[in-house]
């Protein structure tokens, strides 16, 4: 949702992905169907997180509810999810950007959920009419350095 008294400026596109540790029993599949999700142990971000909101909306598009899933744990950070995945046979839903190093190192692998893209956009948010000055300088700086994200 967006508030009318705020200005939203697009910053980064992001994608949520399902990941498993390469030593997990779940690492044998390259892809699953959304209907398989209730049978897979999951670790997810906590209520109120944007990550969980995007995942939940994607589930609803496939007539699935979060309450129908086998969620073992809700955690407060992506880092804690990654640590949990290292020691369990669970699947996590995280930003592709957050697991880049683990994917390159071969510690995690992405399991595609067929037909269930989970895209989101990060925005700069400012009060309408207060778009100048330091906030503009920061937006230029962040935009320039976002190429490395």
What kind of region is each of these model predictions?
Residues 56-60, 64-109:
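Hydrophobic hinge/microswitch elements
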Residues 1-16, 20, 109:
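Short beta-strand-centered segments that line the small-molecule binding cleft or hinge
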Residues 21, 45-46, 94-95:
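Thr-Gly-centered strand-to-loop micro-motif
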Residues 41-63, 132-133, 149:
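Secondary-structure junction motif
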Residues 111-149:
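A late-sequence structural motif
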Residues 7-10, 33-35, 63, 100, ...:
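Short secondary-structure boundary/capping segments
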Residues 9, 35, 82-83, 136:
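Alpha-helical segments flanking ligand/cofactor-binding loops in enzyme cores
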Residues 1, 22, 96-98:
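Short secondary-structure boundary segments
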């Amino acid at each position: 949702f967006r508030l009318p008294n705020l200005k939203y400026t697009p910053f980064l596109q992001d994608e949520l992905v399902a990941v498993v540790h390469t030593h997990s029993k779940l690492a044998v599949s390259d892809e699953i169907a959304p209907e398989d999700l209730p049978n897979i142990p999951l670790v997810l971000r906590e209520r109120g997180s944007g990550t969980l909101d995007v995942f939940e909306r994607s589930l609803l598009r496939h007539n699935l509810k979060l309450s129908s899933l086998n969620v073992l744990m809700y955690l407060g950070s992506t880092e804690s999810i990654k640590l949990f995945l290292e020691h369990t046979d669970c699947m996590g839903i995280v930003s592709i950007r957050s697991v880049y190093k683990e994917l390159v190192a071969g510690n995690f692998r992405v399991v595609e959920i067929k037909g269930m893209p989970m895209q989101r956009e990060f925005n700069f948010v400012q009060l309408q009419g207060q778009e100048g000055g330091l906030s503009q300088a920061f937006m230029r700086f962040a935009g320039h350095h976002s190429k490395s994200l």
